[in-house]
């Protein structure tokens, strides 16, 4: 007798196959759990079976996590599946619409993990509960792990909690950065210490940029971070994908008076550790070019003392003096005469007369530059750039400069230039060693007097 058969459709066969795979997965999971319980030890990460995490947009879940309500978190997250759910948030952001020709509100979905939310906001108790329920410590939902979020917000207690439970100190984001790269504010110093104690690699370069934590700290003027990384073996000679050393990034990040002081302190740490003051990036832009472009006279003088060359041009043919002249226009609220005098004392050549217009409205800086010439050049290039109210305020200086155009200077001034030429790039150091009265020494170093003689 022929055996009767039942015809299965392709969709039914697929459903049966999926059901069979699900049952096999459940059997393996239960067997692994039973084996774990029998050994009385937690299952290893390799033995843990993975399954797709479910997504959640429930406002109640969002409210509990983002507010740090421990009771609600305990009620909502009672097992491993809940602790590892993917939390989705949707926000409207402005985006340019080429078809409509104007900016429109576009919904953007962001994914993260409950543990990342709790640690980023410093909810230590909530984070501890999620970990005990089985939250994956190094899960990168939305590109970052919980340790990244905690370090970026300088949440010391949460960083310590994660590391205590076994989070990897060198876990990478999707872009290839470590938690140490995200210690970017002064308050994150203690977090950085915890990471290094837990085995974080201080010279690990990040993704395409190839920045190390030392580059990041130097770029933000974090002196204590720089000192910490140097103590743990950070290499001051490592370069980014653009050929920049940590000293380059420290000088490039110095913008504004307060920032200049912070970055100068970080640069000093690097120089004392052996950083090369002449190291240039791919565009031959040296740390001195960066310091001058940001108008940081103190930082520039520090670099010059450590061997930076004041006359070397970058890839565009601009010298540090050219960068300093441009900075006068971009950042007027500083004292450019200090920077100009330092560059001239360390071997910079007098500026081209046509460049004097950049500092025409800074009489003290203009005086320093004019005193670098044996004869005051034509004023046609800069006199028209002087503001009328500024001319009235400093009429004595501007009038004296006009009177000395193409006129012979005093013998004392010519003698000053002769001594400076003899000392060359060692002018500032040499002046302090000469047996001269303080007033004459200051005169040799282009002291501002308020008039041209």
Swiss-Prot record:
Effect upon mutating residue 173 to P: Found in a clear cell renal carcinoma case; somatic mutation
Protein species of origin: Homo sapiens
Gene Ontology biological process terms in this record: intracellular signal transduction; protein ubiquitination
Example of a GO cellular component annotation carried by this entry: cytosol
Bilayer-crossing regions: none
ANK repeats: 56-85, 110-139, 142-171, 175-204, 209-238, 242-279, 283-312
Boundaries of every SOCS box domain copy: 398-450
Function: May be a substrate-recognition component of a SCF-like ECS (Elongin-Cullin-SOCS-box protein) E3 ubiquitin-protein ligase complex which mediates the ubiquitination and subsequent proteasomal degradation of target proteins.
Protein name: Ankyrin repeat and SOCS box protein 16
Alphabetical list of CDD domains matching this protein: SOCS_ASB_like
InterPro entries reported in the protein's UniProt record: Ankyrin-SOCS_box_domain, Ankyrin_rpt, Ankyrin_rpt-contain_sf, SOCS_box, SOCS_box-like_dom_sf
Record-linked Pfam families: Ank, Ank_2, SOCS_box
